[in-house]
């Protein structure tokens, strides 16, 4: 699979956190997987754990 960067959007949509550096993710936060521009309003822990595997 291609490498993708995973960033998490907290309360401020302009504030991004790299999931690789902050695993204390709120389950209600939003995130963007850069590269394919996938966006979601709700985070599922399993989705994040899977996405983290692609963080370069």
From Swiss-Prot:
GO cellular component labels: membrane; viral envelope; virion membrane
Compartment list: Virion membrane
Induction per the UniProt record: Expressed in the late phase of the viral replicative cycle.
One BP annotation, GO: symbiont entry into host cell
Note: Immunodominant protein.
Function: Envelope protein that binds to heparan sulfate on the cell surface and might provide virion attachment to target cell.
Protein name, as recorded: Envelope protein H3
Source species of the chain: Vaccinia virus (strain L-IVP) (VACV)
